[in-house]
Amino acid sequence: MNPVVKVDNLSVFYEQHQAIKNIRFQAGPGQMIGILGPNGAGKSTLMKAILGLERYTGTVKVLDKHVRHVRKQIAYVPQRNAIDWDFPVLVEDVVMMGRFAHIPWFKRAGKNDKRLVEESLKKVGMEEYRSRQIGELSGGQQQRVFIARALAQESELFFLDEPFVGIDVTSESIILSLLQELRDRGKTIFVVHHDLSKVEKYFDQVLMLNKELIAYGPVADVYTPEMVAKTYQGNLATFSKKDEVMVVNV
């Protein structure tokens, strides 16, 4: 089975320091992959580099092409703190942004675009908020709207940067269920994640990062106390796996 994402010797430099170094991995279809690591490990940088939003050295192939040629096939949900929630835009217009790549220049959204927007809003339980300003919503509701935008895009790959941070339990459950459904349909999903207590529940594969690639593979093989300790290097209070709890340099 051909990889949908192939990264080889990827490095990113910021002025006088190296953010990530010599990252190599491949990801196939139908996987939900958690990107784990301490603050400053380069998780968001790695995601942005794959998406072509950061300059890098090395090679990145998405669907066997450079990312610039497959942007329609990629949906990206950035961190909430990277979004201007005060910008005056309606919920339905935010979701319609997911259709922009499919709408020809100087053309209006068609019936199919509007149908997909409505269906996406219903999937996240936000159809009754379609005419509300995005800034009026709670954090969880805002995140659901951006997930709806990603759904409307009808992509093959989904990249989400800390989608579960600062949201309510209902929104978390809805988002997780939708992501798992997408995975089961053969989509590939990358998630920057920080809550180690839910890794086994959320992910099939984990990519453990601390400027360099520490480990990558199935959760059962890679998500171990040894790999967690090596990844977090004392920046973690507890590691939880099923009934096992390990204290790491408290």
Swiss-Prot record:
Record's signal peptide: none
Topology within the bilayer: Peripheral membrane protein
Keyword Transit peptide appears in the UniProt entry: no
Pfam name, any one: ABC_tran
GO molecular function: ATP binding; ATP hydrolysis activity
Disulfide bridge partners, by residue number: none
Residues engaged in binding ATP: 37-44
One term under GO cellular component: plasma membrane
Domain ABC transporter per the UniProt entry, residue ranges: 5-236
Protein's name according to its UniProt entry: Manganese transport system ATP-binding protein MntB
Source species: Halalkalibacterium halodurans (strain ATCC BAA-125 / DSM 18197 / FERM 7344 / JCM 9153 / C-125) (Bacillus halodurans)
